[in-house]
Structure formats: structure tokens, C-alpha cells
């Protein structure tokens, strides 16, 4: 868990705001469920979910939850270092690095995550389920698989100097 929201600007993206219903003996009881992504645009990003009787309270809860869930993703030259595939339930997300000037080529929820993360050039394809919550969670599973040069060198038991020649 990274506490970056205290000192940096935040990019907040609302993925979904749903009115949900609970049927009780006296009728229907309505509440709101909010799903958000928060990032600093410099490699830190997190998602959050919140439910409340009022939409603004649900958004506040999801924002608090997202700030608690921040994680670091290594970014190199405005894109990810290598291709990754993330899966969560039946949602599958393919993320490929792109050259400078390509832009963010991604569908709704993945685009919001990439913009909050600070990625400027990326190719992405969402496969399987299009449930926005599962797609975002699959994107975060893909982020867990992203390796930077230091991690690769450590896994191979080499230094960065010998790895790059």
C-alpha cells in the first residue's frame, strides 16, 4: 500500500454508478453503488467500491477505498515495459506496449485505468466478459505481472550491467 494521495495530485475516474434495489417487506429500498479508479498519473493507481443510500456518499466511500488500494506499476517512456495478459473470472485483458504517439487505444474501463496510471501510449483489448468491475480487476491482475528491469535481473541472478551487456 502506497500513501501518495497526501502529497500529489489525484486523477479520479468514475467507472460506474448504479442504483441498486433491495426488496423488503414494505417495498423497495434503493441505494447507490459506485466503482472508481484513482491514480496520480505517475505510476500509482488503485480501484475502489462503495455503497450508500446517497450517490455522493457512495462516491466518497469508493474514493476512500481506492486510495487505500493504491499500487505502483512500472512505466517506461509512457507505456508498459512488455505485453501482459490479466484474467479475473471470465474477463480477460490483453495489454501491449505502444510506440510514442500511438495514444491510449483501450475500451472504457481499461482506458480510465490507463489515464489514471499515467500511460500515454498503449494497445489494449478486452476479451470475454465486458462487466466493467471484472475488466478493471483483470487489468490490475495484469499489472501484477509487469516486471521492470531490476526484477528481471534479480530473477536471473544477474546485475543490470550484465543483463544489458
UniProtKB/Swiss-Prot annotation:
Keyword set includes 4Fe-4S: no
GO cellular component annotations of the record: small ribosomal subunit
Domain S5 DRBM stretches: 10-73
PROSITE patterns: RIBOSOMAL_S5, S5_DSRBD
Keyword terms, alphabetized: Ribonucleoprotein, Ribosomal protein, RNA-binding, rRNA-binding
GO MF term (any one): structural constituent of ribosome
Keyword Transmembrane appears in the UniProt entry: no
A GO BP annotation: translation
InterPro entries documented for this protein: Ribosomal_Su5_D2-typ_SF, Ribosomal_uS5, Ribosomal_uS5_bac-type, Ribosomal_uS5_C, Ribosomal_uS5_N, Ribosomal_uS5_N_CS, Ribsml_uS5_D2-typ_fold_subgr
NCBIfam families reported in the protein's UniProt record: rpsE_bact (TIGR01021)
Domain notes for this protein: The N-terminal domain interacts with the head of the 30S subunit; the C-terminal domain interacts with the body and contacts protein S4. The interaction surface between S4 and S5 is involved in control of translational fidelity.
Annotated family: Belongs to the universal ribosomal protein uS5 family.
Function per UniProt: With S4 and S12 plays an important role in translational accuracy. Located at the back of the 30S subunit body where it stabilizes the conformation of the head with respect to the body.
Subunit structure: Part of the 30S ribosomal subunit. Contacts proteins S4 and S8.
Identification of the protein by name: Small ribosomal subunit protein uS5
Taxonomic source organism: Borreliella burgdorferi (strain ATCC 35210 / DSM 4680 / CIP 102532 / B31)
Amino acid at each position: 500500500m502506497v500513501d501518495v494521495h497526501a502529497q500529489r495530485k489525484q486523477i479520479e475516474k468514475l467507472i460506474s454508478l448504479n442504483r441498486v434495489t433491495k426488496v423488503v417487506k414494505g417495498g423497495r429500498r434503493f441505494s447507490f453503488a459506485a466503482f472508481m479508479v484513482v491514480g496520480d498519473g505517475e505510476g500509482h493507481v488503485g480501484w475502489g467500491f462503495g455503497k450508500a443510500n446517497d450517490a455522493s456518499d457512495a462516491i466518497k466511500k469508493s474514493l476512500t477505498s481506492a486510495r487505500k488500494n493504491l499500487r505502483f506499476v512500472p512505466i517506461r517512456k509512457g507505456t508498459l515495459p512488455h505485453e501482459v495478459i490479466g484474467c479475473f473470472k471470465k474477463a480477460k485483458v490483453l495489454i501491449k506496449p505502444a510506440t510514442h504517439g500511438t495514444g491510449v487505444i483501450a475500451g472504457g474501463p481499461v482506458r480510465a485505468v490507463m489515464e489514471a496510471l499515467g500511460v500515454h501510449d498503449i494497445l489494449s483489448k478486452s476479451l470475454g466478459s465486458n462487466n466493467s468491475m471484472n475488466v478493471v480487476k483483470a487489468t490490475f491482475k495484469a499489472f501484477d505481472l509487469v516486471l521492470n528491469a531490476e526484477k528481471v535481473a534479480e530473477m536471473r541472478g544477474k546485475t543490470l550491467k550484465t543483463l544489458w551487456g
